[in-house]
Amino acid sequence: MALLQISEPGLSAAPHQRRLAAGIDLGTTNSLVATVRSGQAETLADAEGRDLLPSVVHYQADTLRVGWDARQQAAQDPANTISSVKRMMGRSLADVLARYPNLPYQFQASDNGLPMMLTAAGAVNPVGVSADILRALAERAKTALEGDLDGVVITVPAYFDDAQRQGTKDAARLAGLHVLRLLNEPTAAAIAYGLDSGQEGIIAVYDLGGGTFDISILRLSRGVFEVLATGGDSALGGDDFDHLLADWLREQAGVADRSDHGVQRQLLDAAIAAKVALSDADSTVVEIAGWQGEVTRAQFDALIATLVKRTLMACRRALKDAGVSAEEVLEVVMVGGSTRVPLVREQVGTFFGRTPLTSIDPDKVVAIGAAIQADILVGNKPDSDMLLLDVIPLSLGLETMGGLVEKVIPRNTTIPVARAQEFTTFKDGQSAMMIHVLQGERELVQDCRSLARFSLRGLPPLPAGGAHIRVTFQVDADGLLSVTAMEKSTGVEASIQVKPSYGLSDAEIAGMIKDSMANAQSDVGARMLAEQRVEASRVLESLQGALASDAALLSEAESTAIPAAVEALQQATQGTDPAAIEAAIKTLDAQTQDFAARRMDASIRRALAGHSVDEV
């Protein structure tokens, strides 16, 4: 819903005065800013008429260049020219170096392990570099709209995790921007197309940008945009096409020295120019490092065929998650400049069996959708029939006894969402509980990703099972998770907002989902074993307490049979057969039934001692 403006009684709320809002596509390779003017969403160009702003920043001791000017410095001064910084957002230095070992920057670790790049202007980090890009886009919007922005919607890849999303918000704050919402890039594209067409059905959004690939399966119904499933790869995009072609050109040109960053940049620029030319022509001529040769579209297609196939495998997984087939998809929306590559369009069309939609510039469609959403959220539209539902990529839950995972919010649940479950204590007199928040699809804690831990203290010292703790998981519209635990009788409460230090890539998410499928049967067996061991532990602990207080109530036969049944259960718990443990529990239960009945009678007699029948 739109954000409402409230005025003092007797004063006009100036409904005719539009608030200034913008949608920002903060991309890996290029970024854009768009707004709604005269009812139409449009991207805003710079003084030279260029809509795209290269996501590049060049740092010098006393100057800062962003965009095209910075990109021109990349070949001459690569160490001070930061590009594709979005790939580093929310990642540790070790992760960045492992994923991208050939980056021409001088790195150092910050106190929290995040990467810092040493430049002539000092140390900069991915959040600060992103802020410089956002600041340049905001200045462009301010000039075009002749005023400061009241709010922005910034798009992020669908699989950005909490740390990456929070980093984007922090960058916007540093740039002096008020973030109305972070919006998934494929969802923004759906807004750009769906509002105009108003059609209903299943739509696939294929987003292949400079550095990330996302596939989203959406259902459009009566103005409701629901994301059924998402998938992709945060380390796959047009940049990878460029690097493959650059490596091929290096071999053809006989360039052996990989340490010359200037030559590296020239090779990359030549590869980018060739890729663009091959989108319209069957061949193009390349001149680099004294070498001149021809590159054909067929040669380029052969280089990138494996990467394109990887995107289609992700599409197949997303369709399976959504529970739909390719034949059920009505339209395929193409997003990202890399979808201009003829092989990509051809392969995607073949996979889905229909010609992809490209009527909106694939470079601009995400920014346009973000601008439409920003215009609504800032309050320019008092109401809207559009409802937007994103999803979480992996299940969220917490650890229970025995190292088991209790899922509270399943994956692909629409957000924002809040879910709660009740838990209880395991031991008598337990006064504290450790809440361990987990992410993943497996049944055991050891196979899932730990997100956070916090303690709930001050529980009433009741018998096991006496305290009732309500744990609430809440995921906001930006995908950030908060967890609250409250003991119901006392109101004692503790909470935490999950903000992981490091990111989780699409490949790792896909791997976790794949592992859960591959290990489904063994996981079920492991869970059954763990559950029976927990139940056995509970039974043995309860019996130990009963024997400590009422051993005198045992019959002679029970004095022999019960210890034997206890030993049998203890031995069974050392094994790996849940059925054997369950059988041993039942045997022990049968051996202790009469003892339990005598304990109950004795307890009642003690309670009634000294009281008359009338008092009872």
From Swiss-Prot:
GO terms of molecular function: ATP binding; ATP hydrolysis activity; ATP-dependent protein folding chaperone; unfolded protein binding
Keyword hit for Chaperone: yes
Pfam families: HSP70
SUPFAM superfamilies the record matches: Actin-like ATPase domain, Heat shock protein 70kD (HSP70), C-terminal subdomain, Heat shock protein 70kD (HSP70), peptide-binding domain
UniProt entry keywords in alphabetical sequence: ATP-binding, Chaperone, Nucleotide-binding
Single Gene Ontology BP annotation: iron-sulfur cluster assembly
Family: Belongs to the heat shock protein 70 family.
Function: Chaperone involved in the maturation of iron-sulfur cluster-containing proteins. Has a low intrinsic ATPase activity which is markedly stimulated by HscB. Involved in the maturation of IscU.
Protein name as annotated: Chaperone protein HscA
Biological source species: Serratia proteamaculans (strain 568)
